[in-house]
Design a protein with these regions (language model features):
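Conserved acetyl-CoA-binding loop-helix of GNAT-fold acetyltransferases
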Residues: 44-49, 170-187, 204-209
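Conserved active-site alpha-helix within GNAT-family acetyltransferase domains
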Residues: 67-73, 175, 198-216
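Short amphipathic alpha-helix that is part of the acyltransferase structural core
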Residues: 1-4, 89-122, 233-235
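Conserved beta-strand-loop-alpha-helix junction that forms the acyl-donor binding cleft
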Residues: 61-66, 184, 193-204, 220-231
Length: 235
């Protein structure tokens, strides 16, 4: 199984309070994340997306197939993407780590932005942490690793923003933090899932050890609007 059109589904179900809408396109508020969803990747969908992005604005989307060039859009970056689901695995117990795991919140947002800018786990904005439960590890008071929740659809929550400062790799921080986030998800009776670049073999190996299995192969694309359109209409 896989979660079909998961960004669109999230913005039409459990995360409507973060949504901005224009016809058959949805996006998260810009300070939350740049992720956007289309009912269908057709002319109407991209017209709605242009409405949301605004002139020169960017949008990050998930697609079943590689992005095909369209008028009014500049392709910025993209890559093959995997969706992985953990229907079983180690979400109910913490992986071994000597580090103390701390819950993160509003006051930690500047450091979270700094860490994600260094490690590039995916789109992360000043309000991304509002999407769910975020945890981190500090070394000498500095945030060096983190993980949290992002997309939410009925019965499922995504583990996201899993990242570790390069100076602290190999200490088991990612697995420990993911396991804590997965524990919280399972305590709510939900199933963890995630997305990862298909070429990130180091991360995929960690996720497989935690019990995640591949559910979908697709693509992500970051696009920049070159059209002149109206402003988005809030949901």
């Amino acid at each position: 199984m896989h979660l079909k059109n998961v960004i669109w589904q999230a913005l039409n179900t459990r995360q409507t309070h973060f949504a901005e809408c224009c016809d058959t396109a949805r996006r998260f508020m810009s300070e939350v994340t740049s992720l956007c969803g289309l009912a269908e990747p057709n002319d109407d969908g991209y017209a709605g997306l242009a409405c949301l992005a605004g002139p020169g604005g960017t949008a990050a989307i998930f697609l079943d197939r590689p992005y095909a060039r369209r008028a009014g859009w500049e392709y910025v970056v993209g890559a093959p993407l995997l969706q992985m689901i953990c229907e079983n695995g180690h979400g109910s117990r913490r992986m071994k780590s000597q580090a103390k795991i701390l819950e993160l919140g509003d006051k930690d947002s500047p450091e979270m932005l700094e860490l994600t800018a260094q490690t590039k786990p995916g789109p992360f904005g000043p309000r991304t942490h509002e999407l769910g439960y975020y945890v981190g590890i500090r070394d000498n008071e500095k945030l060096v690793a983190m993980a949290g929740e992002r997309l939410k659809v009925p019965g499922f929550t995504e583990v996201s923003a899993v990242c570790t400062h390069p100076d602290h790799l190999g200490k088991g921080y990612a697995a420990a933090l993911m396991t804590e986030v997965m524990r919280a998800i399972r305590e709510r009776g939900e199933t963890p899932f995630l997305h990862v670049r298909a070429d990130n073999t180091r991360a995929i190996a960690i996720y497989e050890r935690l019990g995640f299995r591949m559910a979908w192969e697709g693509h992500f694309a970051v696009l920049r609007s070159t059209a002149v359109v109206g402003e988005a209409r809030p949901a």
